[in-house]
Amino acid sequence: MLALDRVGKTYPNGVHALARFSAEIRQGEIVAIIGGSGCGKSTLLRAIAGLDPASSGSVRLDDIAISAPHEKIGIIFQEPRLLPWLSVADNIGFGLSELPADVRRERVAKALARVGLADKAKAWPRELSGGQAQRVAIARALVPQPEVLLLDEPFSALDAFTRRDLQDHLLDLWADTRPTLILVTHDVDEAVVLADRVLVMRPRPGRLFETISINLARPRDRNSELFDHFKRHVLTSLDRSLDRNVLDAHGRSDEGGAMWW
């Protein structure tokens, strides 16, 4: 269980990025975080990762306080950040040095197959397309089998076809060990196709506005009426999260201790 308890973040320049953000995320759950620009999505993700600890409140994984990077938590950024002097296979196996060589090779080979790059094991990062490089980054993050994997808009720089392809590969890899996935995205379609729950954030400072459960079996049909229903629900919530009148009312209820679930 990942528990976020009234997480807040204020920077030295006085910018109040997050306020009293609380949520509980179950092991193996996929959660998407969505909201308007400047609502603190990436700030929240960095606090969960321990890269930029919260100013107030707490982040706890299995009752362990997280205030610095932790071996049980992995993260994928928008840019793949591959090591250019290592082959694709060595990039994927980079975090497995403590494992026996045969176990390491088996995990890397399985991950390469899962992301459709079995024929690229000996290639160099410079020889890959943007989509291929991000597949390697996903495989590299998942082969150490973290309990939690954080994804900060990992597909936003890719074309629509490649983005959908990588979403499918991500779900294939997730199904092997079922870590908790927390995805920051601006893409409503992506949130609905991947997530068990969507957390909609309100801005300035960032707070939880609404939690939407996506009650759809996988694999999900993007053309179904139910899929469209959940997309409309998320879009409506996003619109309301940016409506000043709604925010004022929501802010008053926050002061009284109410929560939106």
How should each PLM-predicted stretch be described?
Residues A49:
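Helix-to-loop junction immediately C-terminal to a conserved catalytic motif
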Residues G57-P69:
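Conserved ABC transporter NBD signature motif
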Residues I138:
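Hydrophobic anchor residue at the start of the ABC signature
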Residues I34-G36:
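The feature captures the beta-strand-to-loop junction immediately N-terminal to the Walker
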Residues L86-G93:
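Short coil-to-helix segment of the ABC ATPase nucleotide-binding domain corresponding to the Q-loop/switch region
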